[in-house]
UniProtKB/Swiss-Prot annotation:
Disruption outcome: Does not affect the production of oxopyrrolidines A and B.
EC numbers for this chain: 1.-.-.-
Name of the gene this protein is made from: opdD
Key words of the record: FAD, Flavoprotein, Monooxygenase, Oxidoreductase
Family classification: Belongs to the paxM FAD-dependent monooxygenase family.
Record flagged with keyword Flavoprotein: yes
Name assigned to this protein: FAD-dependent monooxygenase opdD
Binding site for FAD: E48, R145
Pathway note: Secondary metabolite biosynthesis
Gene3D superfamilies reported for this sequence: 3.40.30.120, D-Amino Acid Oxidase, subunit A, domain 2 (3.30.9.10), FAD/NAD(P)-binding domain (3.50.50.60)
GO molecular function: FAD binding; oxidoreductase activity, acting on paired donors, with incorporation or reduction of molecular oxygen, NAD(P)H as one donor, and incorporation of one atom of oxygen
Pfam families: FAD_binding_3
Function: FAD-dependent monooxygenase; part of the gene cluster that mediates the biosynthesis of oxopyrrolidines, polyketide-amino acid hybrid compounds with feature structures of tetramic acid. Does not seem to play a role in oxopyrrolidines A and B biosynthesis. May be involved in further modifications of these oxopyrrolidines.
Superkingdom of this protein's organism: Eukaryota
Amino acid sequence: MDLTLARTMEILRPLGLADGLRARGVPSTYPFTVRFSSGLGMKHSLSEWKLPSADQLRERIMSQNDGTMPLEPWLRVSGDVMEAFLKEKCEESHLVTLRFGWSVTQVIESATEVETRVRNPHTGGEKVIRSQYAVGCDGASSLVRKNMGIALDGGPIHSSVVLIHFKSRDLTRLHRQGRFWHTFFLLDPTISGDSVGGAIIAQDEVDTWTVHDFRAPGSKQSISCAEETIYRVLGAMGGPYPITIDEIIQQSTWTPSIALAKSYTGPLHRVFLAGDACHQTIPSGGYGMNMGIADVFDLGWKLAAMIQGWGGAQLVLSYEQERRPVAELMQHWGKVHAGKLMGLASAVTLNATIIDASDARGEEMRQKIHEYVQSNDAHNQCFGVEHGHQHHSDITVTSASSHPPFDPRSYTPTTHPGFRAPHVFLNDGSAIFDKFGKTLTLVEFIDAMPGPSSGGSFFRDTADEHHIPLRIASLVGEANAQQIWGARLVLVRPDHFVSWCGNDVGSKDEAKRVLLQAAGHICR
């Protein structure tokens, strides 16, 4: 986990976490260059994807104010750095109680509450925590999922990956082919069984690295010596490539899994699953951790609404309706990206004896590899998958209008119900996302001087009568934003997704129907 997607940074922004995490990550000037190499012993890499730095992406966001861009650029930050940052924030919050080392032994769901039995690591004693709801974010082997009797579709795939985290300042040798974020190393498939045998990730652009050694089923390669594994992966087709290693931080073996929980909630809808507890995917595309954060951003506001008393029963049911199809979508594209990487050997006959040769055969092979890599570059560029998926659920107010067709590579701005609202900068330079509240927000575009409109008044009166907290963001003279959003009135959820849109509401009853459905009180 070393990529925090732009959508995740949008989520962290209203939580007050985006800037702090960015300060801990790789400096924003460094690009996301992905290289393809037959081994660092060769003079040059075979091809590269020149993905922009966070600064370059932010410049594009500022200049391309047409709704197609995210509000925040992506971020390079390793998982351990991110976890340490979030731990600090939890320790600072009076709303969070931390119990590190404690283990959950049993979760029991009833119609009115959840009983969670936990064990103290120091005394071995157990206690019961009673709550209205519980969320199992306890990983792929989730005890919460098992206690709820929820099965998984799918499971481990027939390969493994050896991960070695290490420190080295031998930059002359590591950067022989140029700086990189990732470098994938090609191997002769007649020897390795696959076209990509490993990779190296630059975790901090200073001295921390991770080598991935992809193991085919039945691999006889030894994993006893981490240094030898690193040399072999870096050398790829050219044989071992020694570097000076300052420290081996950790070595582990990981078995990739593609699995999806049959349900995201217990039978009584008081226990929920999020993250790897309900979906596991291969890391291609960087969807895994980012998907889990989006899960809890969706679920969090809904549980808050239930606890605060303004949410209806459909809210908790909508979590699975919305998030499980997104997991299926991202699992699919993760497999597509991995298939393109591993499919190189089917498109190009890789041969270690000629790949670095200066003759016509070597030149032809290198050119074919370059063409294949450039023609299959969606790996970290599927912004439609990230931003353009639709939430289908009973709390989304259906619309007779059509929505843009799904394009995995690009996001088409739309306020069609169920889609993420488009980011746009307003006339004063502020972001429209920063106008959203912690509950529902009615965005109201006003052409002339500000004043109450019938639409806004109907929604405001309905919200007051039914004790539904509603922010009304009246935007005056915002022609560009209104054109991009395509409607005069848009009801936006706390997670930035659209509940309803229209140019007007003709009556208070219509506003009531929209608001009560968006808050989960009526089913469509």
